[in-house]
């Protein structure tokens, strides 16, 4: 089943979903505590044999509208390799749902936050790198500003405990992965805006860039009030 077909089916005809996806929806609705081994085993059985199903598992979150289910989902994932994969899934989640105007930011951000809390400082850098350099974002210049702003806002949650941007950029610079999206995220950090209003070094000499900074800051403030 094509992803676009699946999404239409998911949002308009949940009864027509594949049997395995129905099982996942059922398990997520059971409201069983994360200590329940049976539920963990069942989720593992459905998730790990097929990575496409791992991706699908994130999709129903906007339908369930239940914080407990979403928190449980991110708690189930323990190993770091899977967490890195989860970063890609979260990115795809934003992009695909945006296409159907079904994006609900709080639910996406909670998943990002819960995953990032499991990682130490170095692992958060890696998680961030996966999030912003995902294959899905290789053509980031063609993405709408709404999607980019949502991703940037999510990235702030990953580093909320210690948002040391100079260190993050230094790490990424070593790997030649400085992207436009990273630049936007750095200049649009709320604390930095309050202290400096805008990064003079980057913006004052370039009218076009300065205007883009202002637009990004405004958009992020709007997103922050959602």
Swiss-Prot record:
The keyword Signal applies. Glycans are attached at residues 142, 164. The keyword Acetylation does not apply. Induction: Expressed in the intermediate phase of the viral replicative cycle (immediately after DNA replication). It comes from the Viruses. Residues 1-16 form the signal peptide. Keywords: Glycoprotein, Host-virus interaction, Inhibition of host NF-kappa-B by virus, Signal. GO terms for biological process: symbiont-mediated suppression of host NF-kappaB cascade. Plays a role in the inhibition of host NF-kappa-B and IRF3 signaling pathways. Mechanistically, promotes the degradation of host IKBKG through enhancing its ubiquitination leading to inhibition of both pathways. Belongs to the asfivirus I226R family. This is Late protein I226R. It comes from African swine fever virus (strain Badajoz 1971 Vero-adapted) (Ba71V).
């Amino acid at each position: 089943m094509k992803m676009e077909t699946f999404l239409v089916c998911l949002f308009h005809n949940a009864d027509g979903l594949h049997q395995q996806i129905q099982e996942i929806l059922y398990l997520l609705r059971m409201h069983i505590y994360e200590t329940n081994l049976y539920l963990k085993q069942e989720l593992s059985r459905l998730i790990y044999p097929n990575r496409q199903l791992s991706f699908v598992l994130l999709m129903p979150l906007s339908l369930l509208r239940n914080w407990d289910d979403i928190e449980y989902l991110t708690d189930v994932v323990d190993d770091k390799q899977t967490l890195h994969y989860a970063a890609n899934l979260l990115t795809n989640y934003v992009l695909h749902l945006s296409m159907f105007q079904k994006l609900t930011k709080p639910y996406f951000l909670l998943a990002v936050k819960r995953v990032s809390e499991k990682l130490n400082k170095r692992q958060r850098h890696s998680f961030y790198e996966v999030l912003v350099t995902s294959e899905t974002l290789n053509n980031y210049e063609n993405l709408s500003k709404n999607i980019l702003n949502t991703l940037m806002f999510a990235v702030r949650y990953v580093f909320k405990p210690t948002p040391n941007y100079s260190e993050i950029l230094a790490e990424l610079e070593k790997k030649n992965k400085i992207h436009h999206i990273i630049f936007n995220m750095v200049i649009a950090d709320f604390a930095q805006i309050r202290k400096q209003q805008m990064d003079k070094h980057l913006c004052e000499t370039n009218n076009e860039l300065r205007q883009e900074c202002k637009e990004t800051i405004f958009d992020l403030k709007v997103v922050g009030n959602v």
